[in-house]
Amino acid sequence: MKDIYIFAIESSCDETSASIVKNGKVDIATTINTQIDTHKLYGGVVPEVASRLHLENITLVIDETIKKSGMKMEDMDAIAVTYSPGLLGSLLVGVEAAKTLSLVYNKPFIKVNHMMGHILANNIGQDLEYPLISLVISGGHTDLIYMENEGTFKYIGRTLDDAVGECFDKVARILDMPYPGGPNVEKLAKEGKCTIHMPKILDDGSYNFSFSGIKSHVNNLVHNMKQRKEEINKPDIACSFQTCVANSLVEKSLAAIKKYNVKNFTIAGGVASNSYIRESLINMCKENNIKIFIPDKKYCTDNATMIGAAAYVLYKKGMFSDLNVNASSHEELSLEEL
């Protein structure tokens, strides 16, 4: 069988990335240009700044990826790009670059949902087994998704307010920690102990999540301690917060696994790089004889390799797009789409 090479582009937020992926599983070459140092100056991602930096870097990232691979664009079987969801201005840069490559080199064009990319990052270097439950945890999403087979998605739970990564960032700001908040909260939590009471997260029997309550609890806790001029034990707050969040993710995931009677589980998204949360979910699977699939940490945060992995599934299904595709800031995965 002929090897399939897909050139993929990712620009949904604050990383400009390009990758060449073979057969949806082998990372031939990947380049990532991160904007973290720039956005750190503003305390978070500024959409207008992000899109301008994507414009400055997209050509360099594409050229560097081709150079590292030793291949030519003519060797590619398709061009793929993240078209949704994400920051609209950022998405547009990647989409237009991919359209241009598709047109100039006469290659099939594949639009990829960003969340599909995160989930199928688990295909890189390993073979997913179905049916499965996937937990997608990132700055914009906290979703439980049932996949009966490759390329089918059914939402069974989601956040009702803040996404888990967003909550980490907001708690980091409450604790006067710099951007990016999530990794800094995780680092601080390692220095603390779980000594502070945190409220149960949406214990309603559903598979949905809600993080606004624990965020408000931490905010009120810190505010009241400041008012009373008490010493604020930031490591213990971070540790207690992180433990509470991890427990909620474990409880909801396990409930979904049992409900759908599956033996396979994946985690995906940027928050999946959090070591404590990873270990909590790994232990859950060990204790319940569930096979867990986890991407390498470098494939958890935004990258084009995961887009190439997802595009391969669409390639096999013949799901190509015309060049009239537009970027969209909000578009969900659906069974009907695939």
Give residue spans per PLM region.
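Conserved phosphate-binding catalytic cores of ATP/NTP-utilizing and phosphoryl-transfer enzymes
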Residues: M1-K2, V112-I133, A310
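A contiguous, well-structured pocket-lining segment that forms one wall/lid of small-molecule binding clefts
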Residues: K72, K187-F265, N274-N288, Y315-G318, ...
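Short glycine-rich phosphate-binding loop at a beta-alpha junction
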Residues: M73-Y83, N261-V271, F293
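N-terminal beta-alpha supersecondary unit
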Residues: I4-D75, V81-P85, H114, H118
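Glycine-rich phosphate-binding/hydrolytic loop that grips phosphoryl groups
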Residues: I119, P295-L335
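Glycine-rich phosphate-binding loop plus the immediately following alpha-helix
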Residues: S138, N149-E191, K215-N224
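Conserved phosphate-binding/catalytic loops in two-lobed NTP-binding clefts
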Residues: K111-V112, F265, I282-M306
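Short beta-strand scaffold segments in enzyme catalytic cores
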Residues: T16-V21, S134, T142-Y146
